[in-house]
Regions:
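Generic surface-pattern signal
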Residues: 68, 123, 127-130, 146-155, ...
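Alpha-helix initiation/capping motif
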Residues: 37-38, 46, 59, 95, ...
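Generic detector of well-ordered alpha-helical segments enriched in charged/polar residues
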Residues: 37, 41, 45, 60-64, ...
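A broadly tuned preference for mixed-charge, low-complexity surface segments
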Residues: 10, 15-29, 119-132, 156-166, ...
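A boundary/linker detector
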Residues: 1-53, 276-277, 281-288
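C-terminal, charged low-complexity interaction regions
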Residues: 157-296
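Polybasic, low-complexity binding patches
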Residues: 88-100, 108-152
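Histidine-centered nuclease catalytic patch
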Residues: 49-117
Length: 296
């Protein structure tokens, strides 16, 4: 692999390192994979901006796991080989659990969009839904805010008021307990067998919460099933994300969140993730930290 042209001037540290590497690895002919190419591009970009980059947490293997995404979470368009990895929460930067794959068009402006700017842009877009704000339509700003909120530490009440316009991408670490609960409940409907699990889901909740949970869960399912028809019928994950834009779903979700504090949300997520779901693997934050401590 050849570094970008601006890095090939004589005396440039990237060129010097590249030339030393070529001499040391002259006999190696194995081509770089797409994940390795992206990893090197990330390291170079972080170095050029002076950003911290955790070599232990971010590896080509981690980036390869992001490639399960087939569509940009913001535009909804199919991702190609030129898709870019960006940090969800800019303040946390290049760390595992804070990375997502997006289209090049979104990546170009993503590094200038922090949480406050995203919220402000969404408010302006909501006020003028037919007008693009900062070059993006209302539906895209809703997804930007939804995605950024998942990796941005927020007050419990604020996190609980946000609709899940984007389901959590692979490998993202959700930092707000109420959104963990929101995501786990939504994902229950994204995999087969939800009908058999519905009763045990309700039983996981305290008795005082079960009625509100059932009203919310049934509303979310009904709205997801109403999304599109025939050839326009979306995949269930996309249908669930769209269902979160429904006023009835949000109103019933807010009734649930009014009765669930952060501690109870964590307890419920722990209960709900004990049983595996087909094709879905949920790792709790505490489990990750414990494994890292054992490996240290």
């Amino acid at each position: 692999m050849v570094p970008p042209a601006p890095c090939l001037w004589p005396g440039h540290p990237i060129r010097e390192g590249w030339e030393r590497g070529r001499r040391a690895m002259a006999r190696r002919t194995r081509p770089a994979t797409l994940a390795v190419t992206r990893w090197l591009a990330l390291r170079l970009a972080a170095w050029q901006r002076g950003d911290a980059f955790d070599d232990h947490q971010i590896t080509p293997q981690v980036l390869r796991s992001l490639e399960v995404a087939t569509h940009c979470p913001i535009t909804g368009r199919a991702l190609q080989n030129d898709a870019c990895v960006v940090p969800v929460d800019l303040r946390r930067g290049w760390v595992a659990g804070n990375l997502v794959l997006v289209s090049p068009q979104i990546a170009e402006r993503w590094m200038t969009i922090d949480w406050e700017l995203a919220k402000d842009a969404l408010a302006r877009a909501e006020a003028e839904p037919e007008t693009q704000v900062e070059g993006l339509p209302l539906r895209h700003w809703r997804r930007v805010v939804a995605l950024k909120s998942l990796a941005t530490p927020l007050p419990h009440d604020e996190a609980g008021r946000l609709p899940l316009h984007v389901l959590p991408p692979n490998r993202i670490r959700l930092v707000n307990p109420i959104q963990e609960l929101q995501a786990v409940l939504t994902l229950q409907l994204a995999v087969p067998g939800w009908g058999q699990r519905a009763r045990s889901l309700a039983e996981s909740f305290p008795e005082a919460l079960r009625t509100e949970f059932n009203l919310f869960f049934n509303s979310l399912l009904a709205q997801a099933l109403r999304q599109g028809h025939g050839d326009m019928k979306p995949e269930m994950r996309d249908a669930l994300a769209a269902a979160w834009g429904n006023e009835v779903v949000m109103r019933r979700w807010l009734r649930v969140t009014a009765l669930v504090d952060a501690a109870l949300a964590e307890t419920l997520v722990e209960r709900l993730t004990r049983e595996p779901m087909p094709g879905l693997y949920v790792v709790r934050h505490g489990e990750v930290e414990a494994r890292q401590a054992l490996a240290a």
